[in-house]
């Protein structure tokens, strides 16, 4: 059980749910510039496994690192933090 706590966990926004059992999650992080100290925003997209196809476009989700599930999938959906409001 202690090994499971060492897995990376990211929170991001679902930007694509068109694939079957797969979502694309955009994770935004801030890094401080080493010389100037300014915080710079970085973003990266991760593909995550969604077994029940429950996450929808715009949802805020938490993804957890797992074994390689395909050529590009290394994460799985852990929980839906906030559902998107459709207007």
Swiss-Prot record:
Provide the alphabetized UniProt keywords: Ribonucleoprotein, Ribosomal protein, RNA-binding, rRNA-binding
Q: Which domain of life, per UniProt?
A: Bacteria
| A GO term, aspect molecular function | structural constituent of ribosome
Q: Which InterPro entries match?
A: NA-bd_OB-fold, Ribosomal_uS17, Ribosomal_uS17_bact/chlr, Ribosomal_uS17_CS
Q: Which GO terms describe its biological process?
A: translation
Q: Name one GO cellular component term.
A: cytosolic small ribosomal subunit
| Pfam families for this protein | Ribosomal_S17
Question: What role does this protein play?
Answer: One of the primary rRNA binding proteins, it binds specifically to the 5'-end of 16S ribosomal RNA.
Q: Which family does it belong to?
A: Belongs to the universal ribosomal protein uS17 family.
Describe the protein's quaternary organization and the partners it interacts with: Part of the 30S ribosomal subunit.
Q: Which PANTHER family does the entry link to?
A: 40S RIBOSOMAL PROTEIN S11 FAMILY MEMBER, SMALL RIBOSOMAL SUBUNIT PROTEIN US17M
What is the protein name for this chain?
Answer: Small ribosomal subunit protein uS17
């Amino acid at each position: 059980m202690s090994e499971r706590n060492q897995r990376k966990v990211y929170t991001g926004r679902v930007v694509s749910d068109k694939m079957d059992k797969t979502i694309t999650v955009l994770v935004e992080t801030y890094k401080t510039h080493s010389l100037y100290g300014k915080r710079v925003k970085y973003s990266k997209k991760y593909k995550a496994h969604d077994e029940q196809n429950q996450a929808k476009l715009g949802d805020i989700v938490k993804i957890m690192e797992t074994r390689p599930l395909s050529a590009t999938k290394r994460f799985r959906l852990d929980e839906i933090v906030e559902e998107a409001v459709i207007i």
